[in-house]
Amino acid sequence: MIYLCDYKGIDFIAMQECGRYYKHQNVSEGVNTVFDLLQNRMENPTLDNQACFLVFDEWSGFLASVPKKQQEEFKQKLASILMLGRGVGIFLLLAMQRCDTTNFLSGARDNFGVALGLGRLSKESARMLFSDEADLIEPKPRGHGYLRVDGQPTVEIVIPKIRDMSITDKVIKNALCE
C-alpha cells in the first residue's frame, strides 16, 4: 500500500486519479491519513499488517508553505512515523532537493535507515545525509551519488536511466490504485 504526496503536483500527475495520491495543498491530508493509520495500528496491534509506504516528494517545499505552528505539527507527525512506523509496517520515503536539519525535529533524522544523495549535494545536505562521512562527499553528475544503508559505510552508486517512463508509471499507478 503506497500513499504518494506530490507537493509540486507535477512529477506524478499521471497518478492523479488514484485515491492515495495527494498533490499540492492536499499533501497534508496524506500525512494525516498515514499518521492516523500509525495510531490505529499501535492501538490495535496485529502481526499481519500490510506494509504501508508514505512517499513524500518535496517535503521541504511543503514545510515552507505552511505557518510555523503547522510546520511543527507536521514535523512531529513525521518524527512519529519515522520512530514508530517500522514496528507496525509503516515506512517513509522522502525526496527533497535541499536536505537540512531544519526540516526535522531533533533526533528524527537518525531514524532513517537508508540515505541516498544524488548529484551536486550541498555541504549541508552531505552533513545531513552522511554526517560522519560528509567530508568525503564530492559533487557528482546526474544519476550518480552516494548511498548509506543501516549505518554501513557509504558507497558510491549510479542510478540507471529509465528508458520508458510509461512502464514505470504503470507500476506506480498499480501500487497506488490497488
Regions found by a protein language model. Give the residues of each.
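Flexible glycine-/small-residue-rich
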Residues: 6, 56-58, 120, 149-151, ...
